[in-house]
Regions:
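Crotonase-fold acyl-CoA enzyme core
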Residues: 138, 202-316, 350, 358
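Helix-loop "lid/cap" segments that line or gate small-molecule binding pockets
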Residues: 273, 285, 325, 329, ...
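Terminal peptide-recognition signature
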Residues: 108, 112, 126-127, 145, ...
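Amphipathic alpha-helical segments at domain termini/boundaries
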Residues: 47-107, 111, 278-312, 320-331, ...
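Charged catalytic carboxylate motif
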Residues: 122-126, 196, 203, 303, ...
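Conserved CoA-thioester-binding segment of acyl-CoA-metabolizing enzymes
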Residues: 2-9, 13, 24-25, 29-32, ...
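Glycine- (often His-adjacent) and acidic-residue-rich active-site loop
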Residues: 115, 147-199, 250
Length: 375
């Protein structure tokens, strides 16, 4: 049953997502993982993959669309104030006791619903930190980027509404001396302004994971650009709204936020979105090619986890190389460098490359006779 408001949501302990468990990585219910030893430690965290659990281990319900039975808080991030960070899990209970197993998906959510999940420099610091942790977690294949809600003030929903204009200075968004401050009078004069959300965009673009924007409400300004930079986007039919407000506040995303949008929806439509700053629905964005799926609001989590389940059935190496290949055409020499590095690493795995290395270390001439000039 689903409790009303932000109370605990409990649906029982069915497999995660409408398509069942994450079978591709050996994480279906009750089955040991051939890729991940249940007794092994999680990369970047302490403790085994398979754990005993009880109801007291469930995390708080951080959003109305968040099902605590499907998630656990990621250890080491208890100090987050502007975000929440959770790892997908499958939980079972039976005659042999209750067990919990990690799934290859994480949920990263803006947690400032009272200001439409606007970001400040502190928010961006946290966002980079958790995304980089996900990047370095070798058992995570999908990152769900979303926004908690609704707003306690008016019940409105937001994915992210961009930079918090209250603390924007002449040189960028400013740190405040008091993390809870809401106005410019608390700005810390010792720290320069920031626009490092662009560093987050680059991280999303280059991390070898599929980043899915799960848009449950407003995606505006810098939040609109984050959805554009993400690999995939799922939007709420009832509450998702898209609006590029940069020009309204004397700002502009002249990088990924505009260039990639033009790739997705075409030059004329992208210019309309920026120049006119109109509000667009999820159905509009779907028709234009800026969104992959539109689902009912209460199905957002199911749909996002289904994406993650399907991605987990694919080759991690193939997903990695496909992402970098898609990026290559738009990222110039920087994109070529990323792709070239990954291609070189793949070449290192061949017997031919091993022969070259071993010959050097053994101070002999390499024997290439077993490696034809294939065509």
């Amino acid at each position: 049953m689903r409790a009303s408001g932000r109370g605990l949501l409990v649906r029982g302990l069915a497999p995660c997502g409408p398509g069942g468990g994450f079978e591709g990585h050996g994480l279906s219910l009750g089955a040991p993982s051939p890729r991940l030893d249940p007794g092994a430690a999680r990369p970047g965290a302490a403790g085994p993959l398979a754990r005993v659990w009880d109801v007291s281990d469930l995390p708080p319900q951080v959003s109305e669309t968040f099902d605590p039975t499907r998630w656990r808080a990621v250890a080491g991030f208890e100090d987050l104030t502007d975000l929440t960070y959770h790892r997908g899990v499958e939980r079972t209970s039976g005659p042999d006791g209750a067990a919990e197993r990690d799934l290859p998906v994480v949920r990263v959510a803006f947690d400032r619903p009272e200001v439409r999940n606007a970001f400040r420099p502190h928010t961006v610091d946290e966002l980079y930190r958790v995304l980089d942790h996900a990047r370095m977690s070798s058992d995570v294949g999908t990152v769900l980027l979303t926004g908690n809600g609704p707003s306690p003030k008016d019940g409105g929903w937001a994915f992210c509404s961009g930079g918090d204009q209250r603390i924007r200075g002449r040189d960028g968004y400013r740190y405040t001396s008091d993390p809870d401050a809401e106005h410019a009078d608390a700005i810390d004069p010792a720290r320069a302004g920031r626009l490092h959300i662009l560093e987050v965009q680059r991280l999303i673009r280059t991390m070898p994971k599929v980043v899915v924007a799960v848009v449950g409400g407003w995606a505006a300004g810098g939040g609109h650009s984050l959805h554009v930079v993400a690999d995939l986007t799922i939007a709420s039919r009832q509450h998702a709204r898209f609006m590029q407000t940069d020009a309204n506040v004397g700002s502009f995303d002249g990088g990924y936020g505009s260039a990639l949008l033009a790739r997705q929806v075409g030059q004329k439509r992208a210019r309309e979105i920026f120049f006119l700053a109109r509000e667009y629905s999820a159905e509009d964005a779907l028709a234009w090619g800026a969104v992959n799926d539109v689902v009912d609001h209460d199905q957002l989590e199911d749909a996002a986890l289904e994406y993650a389940r399907i991605i987990a059935t694919k080759s991690p190496q193939a997903i990695r190389m496909l992402k970098f290949a898609f990026n290559l055409a738009d990222d110039g020499l920087a994109g070529q460098q990323v792709f070239a590095g990954e291609a070189t690493r793949l070449a290192y795995m061949t017997d031919e490359a091993v022969e070259g290395r071993d010959a050097f270390l053994q101070r002999r001439d390499p024997d290439w006779s077993g490696f034809p000039y294939a065509y």
